[in-house]
């Protein structure tokens, strides 16, 4: 469960290393985001020469959470870290590579480009 002020690792090569959640999108007064949800975030750490700079306000999709997600078959999936991928308005990633595994829930959210770039889908 990701909420406002949560810091997330960035799992792509867009140039950002860490982002801070500003707002969870999807409804008035929504408090938490899970895997596959879109957030508005600020870049807190960035690599030199990257496409995004420190202080940029970006949209990102959650790809891994420590709290995990419950699936329809009753199983749960949890990860070691909270991570997100920075996206454009059309749900495509800003970077060209995805690092680490991503959850299968992204497929239902329409993030097929992220699923196809990921090295592993769990």
Swiss-Prot record:
Indicate the segments annotated as coiled coil, or none if absent: none
Q: Which GO terms describe its cellular component?
A: cytosolic large ribosomal subunit
Superkingdom, taxonomy of origin: Bacteria
Gene name of this polypeptide: rplN
Q: What is this protein called?
A: Large ribosomal subunit protein uL14
**Source organism (scientific name):** Streptococcus pneumoniae serotype 4 (strain ATCC BAA-334 / TIGR4)
Kindly name one Pfam family recorded for this protein.
Answer: Ribosomal_L14
Q: Does the keyword Flavoprotein apply?
A: no
Q: What does this protein do?
A: Binds to 23S rRNA. Forms part of two intersubunit bridges in the 70S ribosome.
Family, per the entry?
Belongs to the universal ribosomal protein uL14 family.
NCBIfam families registered for this protein in UniProt: rplN_bact
Q: List the disulfide bonds.
A: none
